[in-house]
Design a protein with these regions (language model features):
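Ferredoxin-reductase
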Residues: 2-13, 75-170, 369
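Metallocofactor- and cofactor-centric catalytic cores in central/energy metabolism, strongly enriched
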Residues: 57, 116, 121, 516-518
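Short beta-strand segments
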Residues: 83, 147-153, 313-316, 401, ...
Length: 558
């Protein structure tokens, strides 16, 4: 259900009190006996709010100590790259982490400009550090680096987040995050094992080193994007960083590569007062949401399109992207993925490994499969979460990984790994490359794909639930679906494992020739999500969703 104020400008009542949010970070102490106050890692680390005693100083002390102990046991002896975004809680949490990491003798690399550092920039720094002399990636041996990014991604301004990237540069696997969370929760109940020094001492110690993340990342971008094509075409690219960590990267990209990039809204404000309200009535900095991006779209339609041929967006930690085209608005991430797949695998990356696959999550559109099949590209379908692309991108088995929630990354032009975490900057730049090379923007190319492969209707519905009900999703099987048809079509598969890697999906996916739905719990919120798509009609999509809800509710009630 869409909130009445969705798409409307934020009002004073919608804004956080920054001093209160930061004050509660230090003042409130979590009780490890209360489930909601424990350390819980979702697909992207620990997230919560200081106001709800779910993201406080004690959490970060415990998690940082647990990470220091984990990397020691794992034999990680190189530097730890530390990034953070523009959320109000990110600065305090970053300082807390430095206090604990230094006390544990961890060599940390922080931004030499004291700037925000996006998620993909940390991933790229880890991977380039861990590259062997012959250009291959190392994941074993002395001197390997890892990292931490302090971010709740596009979550509301009240929230904080803290995630660990191991030596492979991307989201940590479940066995790693589970071990860190278990140790952190032990420490929450007993701080005796924690080492910590005051920040003023820690930041000046031999264990903290400045590193120019921005220049390191921007200098390397030419190995991923064809800047010559963009520059020679004169394509005018607008960028809205949504008040996030990429804000100071775009001017350097523009200057270094001689492009025509303009930053539409360069302000950084931890209240995000310049945003329009998202679908659920909250301020959420999601560059793929038509509601959150309505303020930008209105500004463009009021005359700013005179300056730009297309506009890209990034979220607070710049791991998600959004593409806005004239006479179209915000593109559906599924549609943009399909356009990228056809462009990249259709002859524009000749240096990629032969046979490297398209990686997609199982809740992404089947349009991607149809496009890939038309150019003989293999598709590997994995569970939700970018962590499932880490190893395939690392090895080159997958050349492109994309998910419906506007996260993607892809290989360098020479076929080596770029990042193993989502990168919101390169999709925006790729949109400019695609426009320059084809003479058509991504929305126009999507319309051509619809003519060839058919139109589809896609929707996600979120439903409140409990921790107990969320746990039941892991027990769902194909037998829980008694029906033989879905929206009038014969069911062709009832999946509890992803076909691409046979990993458990933590829920259920049911498919027919032209319809499908998938149901799974959120990793960070007490909701479950039902995704559905139909290539038949909007009415068929509604029927798919109705029948999916019956299946899920019946399974959860047993």
């Amino acid at each position: 259900m869409v909130a009445n104020n969705a798409g409307q400008p934020a009002t004073p009542a919608d804004l956080i009190n920054v001093d209160e949010v930061i004050g509660k970070y230090y003042d409130l102490v979590p009780d490890p006996e209360v489930p909601e106050q424990r350390v819980i890692f979702g697909t992207s680390g620990h997230r919560g709010s200081s106001l709800k005693t779910s993201f406080n100083e004690a959490h970060i002390i415990a998690i940082s100590q647990a990470i220091a102990e984990y990397r020691k046991k794992a034999g990680v002896t190189g530097p730890l790259y530390l990034g953070s975004d523009t959320h109000a809680l990110s600065g305090p949490a970053k300082k807390t982490a430095i206090e604990v990491l230094v006390a544990n003798g961890v060599h940390g690399r922080v931004d030499s400009r004291d700037d925000f550092v996006p998620t993909p920039v940390v991933s790229q720094a880890i991977l380039t550090h861990n590259r062997a002399a012959d250009g291959t990636q190392r994941f074993e041996g002395e001197g390997l680096a890892d990292g931490i990014v302090v971010t709740p991604s596009h979550n509301p301004p009240t929230d904080g987040g803290f995630k660990y990237d191991p030596v492979t540069g991307g989201p940590a696997p479940a066995e790693t995050t589970n071990a860190i969370a278990a140790r952190a929760n032990q420490l929450l109940g007993d701080f005796k094992s924690i080492k910590r020094v005051p920040y003023e001492e820690a930041i000046k110690s031999e264990y903290v080193e400045g590193f120019d993340f921005r220049e390191h990342y921007v200098d390397d971008l030419e190995n991923v994007i064809d800047f010559d094509v963009i520059r020679n075409s004169g394509v005018r690219l607008g960028i809205d960083p949504l008040g996030g960590a990429s804000v100071n990267y775009w001017p350097l990209i523009n200057e270094k590569y001689g492009l025509n990039i303009g930053v539409v809204r360069p302000e950084v404000d931890p209240t995000w007062r310049f945003m329009t309200i998202d679908h659920d009535g909250k301020i959420r900095m999601d560059p793929s949401s038509p509601y959150a991006m309505k303020g930008l779209v209105d500004e463009l339609n009021a005359g700013a399109w005179d300056k730009y041929d297309l506009v890209g967006g990034t979220d607070p930690d710049a791991d998600r992207h959004g593409i806005v085209c004239p006479n179209w608005g915000v593109m559906n991430p599924n549609h943009y993925i399909a356009v990228c797949v056809e462009y990249l695998f259709g002859g524009n990356r000749p240096g990629w490994p032969e046979g490297a696959a398209v990686g997609k999550t199982l809740v992404s559109s089947s349009l991607i499969d149809r496009v890939a099949a038309s150019i003989n590209a293999k598709v590997i379908e994995v569970p939700v979460g970018f962590k499932w692309f880490v190893d395939p991108l690392f090895s080159g088995e997958v050349a492109f990984g994309g998910e419906e929630s506007s996260g993607m990354s892809f290989l360098r032009k020479d076929g080596r790994v770029w990042t193993t975490d989502k990168d919101g900057l390169i999709p925006d730049l790729l949109a400019a490359e695609i426009t320059a090379k084809t003479g058509k923007n991504p929305a126009q190319l999507h319309q051509e794909q619809v003519e060839r492969f058919g139109e589809s209707w896609y929707k996600r519905v979120d439903t409140p639930t409990t921790l107990e009900q969320k746990a039941k999703f892991a027990k769902l099987t194909g037998d829980d679906v008694a029906a033989t048809q879905l929206a009038g079509e014969d069911i062709t598969a009832k999946l509890t494992e992803a076909p691409g890697n046979h990993a458990k999906i933590g829920g259920l996916k049911v498919t027919t020739k032209d319809n499908w739905f998938a149901a799974r719990p959120s990793g960070t919120e007490n909701i479950y999500k039902v995704y559905a798509e139909s290539f038949v009609s909007p009415e068929a999509l509604d029927k798919v969703l109705d029948e999916a809800t019956v299946v899920v509710d019946k399974a959860l009630s047993e």
